[in-house]
Amino acid sequence: MAVPKSKKSKSRTRMRRSHDRLAMNTYIEDATSGELRRPHHIDLKTGMYRGKQILEPTDDI
């Protein structure tokens, strides 16, 4: 069975764990509708993506 040869320091452990944090989702304001949406995603309110109509617009309030 694998056993560590020496103890890992707190510094080494914490440096390794520094990449384990969760990233927050980023949102941008759509230029045409003013709605918040994820970058590189369809605006679900208008159905537009990069200036083209992809989906039918929704009328949900």
Curated annotation (Swiss-Prot):
Tagged with keyword Ribonucleoprotein: yes
**Cellular component terms per the entry's GO annotation:** large ribosomal subunit
List UniProt keywords, sorted A-Z. Ribonucleoprotein, Ribosomal protein
Gene Ontology terms describing biological process: translation
Coiled-coil annotation: which residues? Answer: none
> Its Gene Ontology molecular function terms?
structural constituent of ribosome
A Pfam family annotated for this chain is Ribosomal_L32p
Similarity remark: Belongs to the bacterial ribosomal protein bL32 family.
Q: What is the protein name given in its UniProt record?
A: Large ribosomal subunit protein bL32
Q: Which gene name belongs to this protein? A: rpmF
